[in-house]
Amino acid sequence: MAKTSGGTNNYAKAGARVIAVTSTGRKMTAKQAAKVKDTSESIDSLKHREVVKQLNRGVSRYEKVMGVRERTIRIANTGNEYGVTFINENGSQGIYLNKRVFNQTRNQIEASYKKSNYETGFKNLTNRPIQHTITHELAHATWTSSYTGAKQKAAGVEIKSLYRSWARDRKKTGYGTYGASNVDEFWAEVVTKGIHGKADKYTKKAISIARKYKL
């Protein structure tokens, strides 16, 4: 799977036009984004029922903790990316997961994800590797620094402050390098850790911000 550790923060660049940003923070070209849409299918079309069940549990868990519902979650040909989120300045325009990856068995998906993301220290540690990508993308759908709604902008002030405090903390544990890329990846990873990993003062604060502003 593709991997990046920083550079341009494409989540901060959404405007009126919809853009597609991958789970590693890369902005897709218009042609690539169109291919994702054109090849999309229902999650229910996946081969293995246990994988479908795990993804649906991930969505349900997110909705329960964060109080946020995302209407469009599908699988598609997303190249070498685990997932893609379509956004504009008004919010999420849909989440698409990698059809090839999630058409494997649960054990295959989890083993691969642990090896490429947890063992390398790239992503935050969680107890639900198969649900990590969908939760990460749901967090992006909930908030990015480019959203222009009043409550999203107000929440952003607190999220950015939390990010700065987190970045200065040399004693924090359970975090990967990806969250340090920018405030948007910090948000997605800290929320994911809070929902599926070991909670701490940063995960608790992030979730409380989402609830406070009803994101």
How does the language model describe each region?
Residues 16-215:
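Active-site-flanking segments in enzyme catalytic domains
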Residues 1-13, 188:
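Non-Sec secretion/translocation targeting segments of pathogen effectors
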